[in-house]
Amino acid sequence: VALGVAASSLARSAAAPPTLTLSPCDVPGLEGKARCGTYEVWENRETRSGRRISLKVVVVPATGPDRAPDPFVFLNGGPGESSTDGAPDLAHEFAKLRDRRDILLVDQRGTGGSHPLNCEIFLPPGDLQGALGAFFPLEPIRQCRGRLEKDTDLKLYTTSIAMDDIDEVRAALGYDRLNILGGSYGTRATQVYMRRHPERVRTAILYGVVPMDDKMPLHIPPGAERALKGVLAECAQEAACHAAFPKLEEESNVVWSTLGKGPVRARVLNPKTGEPTDVSLSRDLAAEGVRYMLYSSSAAGEVPAVLHQAALGDYTPIAERALSGRLQIVATGSTGMYLSVTCAEDVPWIDPKEAERLAAGTFIGDYRYVQQRAACALWPKGSIPKGFLEPVDAPVPTLLISGMWDPATPPFDAEQVARYLPKSLSIVVPHGGHSLDGLEGVECVTNLQIQFVERGSLEGLSTGCIDQIRRRPFRVEPLELKVIALSEADVTKFLGSYLEDGGPSQAEIVRRDGKLHIQFAAEGEYLLAPVAPTRFRLVGVSGLVLVFDVEGGAVRAARLLDSGSPVLKLVPKAPKAN
């Protein structure tokens, strides 16, 4: 039975806004029913004529009897990532908040299920060397533009236009005010919404904060350099890590010097076959691989070991991480939407001399800016409102969260934004990267967000638990890339359905063409490559393995290079089937 949700009487338009009808739906990985639908908006909001596009909307309803009128909204990063894909994880992480509040998720125009601007820039599939080529390969981008322009005006997918879409959806659902959580680029989107619709925001959380004048990718080189030095310094302060790598800074210099002389050979697991494959690794891609690792607090704990191996001539771990990062971009992001945003809001405003200065002497260098500028020369440039790059000063209670060693959005960025927000608090998570995975005590951050939204104010918010967050021990053992053969009986005993122990994930382990695959309900499918009788690599996800507990019938997924710390535990859902 469809659910009709009345439109808000406080809508900005004089005419009553359309009523958005949502229907009960199943979301993979989500326990219980959600409510789903689509909402049409004008592609050209200014002229209100021509093409209309559909936005994907998911509401995860509140579970308790005492319901608050203002939902919790998530705006994802990228730019280009889907927000609705995060429904299961958000419902699990913020279960206490969901007791009283709906979780509202809308895929921003150009992403996910909202007229996605996807570009297949690293094809053909299985071409590993192609996937390890330019970050913005120009011919595929030119072809993607030609394909998308058949039914899209690529100049109309900027942040300001998209945030007016979100407000229209809010009104159509009958919500008066929102509690917004923005992550990474989503913090820019949140600030834009706060500027354009301040009376509609009850609270805002900015996680991995992007200042309005950040000009992506201008600050990638110095940000990554700062993060790398910080992580290596923490290794030097840990007894075991320092003992294993006493000359780590010197070894790091050797790696970048060697790569600066030309590409090196490395070996990666082919995500299609699971077989080791030789590839050529450039300095740019090696730097990108290390930068990807620094994004993750857990993977950053592997950086010293990976650089040490590379200094000894083994570049396989770096190549694996560069490849998995590229595959993740293809799987989760909309390259066309990324270009439509950054080619209007960022790249045109970068001074080439400033880009050269900020990149000088960093391990990243200027390759990203040079390639992104060339890509934007091929992409239509949208317009931005006057004053778009100016700081936002909305009087909205705002909690800003940064990781100490975030390579993309360092704490300084949050301080810069908070300076103009009269009701704000900025906190820095020790040891944290762009994501806070793998840190001990990190549930403190989630609890602070929940308390803040429930109170609607920063008054009395105690942040002392932040100081108790710790990094797990650095990985000091080398990564070995090896694949073994398994018998039919060995493969068969692992088949079946699994549930995450205490979490939202659902998975199916299946056999296809004699190989095992794990299919996550919400996260996609991965080939499993056996490295031991009960131990499998998730091909294309760097540093992750599945460890089967055959006696207990459970499966544990652990990151290969963080001393076996579990990140996911699966338990059988049903009896094993052949």
Question: Which stretches of residues belong to each language-model region?
Answer:
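Peripheral terminal and inter-domain segments
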Residues: 371, 472-578
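Structural motif
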Residues: 269-287, 295-299, 328-336
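Generic recognition of flexible, low-complexity loop/linker segments
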Residues: 328-330, 385-390, 414-416, 484-486, ...
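Gly/Pro-rich cap/lid or specificity-loop segments adjacent to the active site
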Residues: 12-285, 340-479
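Bacterial N-terminal signal peptides
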Residues: 1-8
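Intrinsic disorder and flexible/low-complexity segments
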Residues: 302, 325-326, 371
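Long, low-complexity segments enriched in small/aliphatic residues
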Residues: 307, 314-353
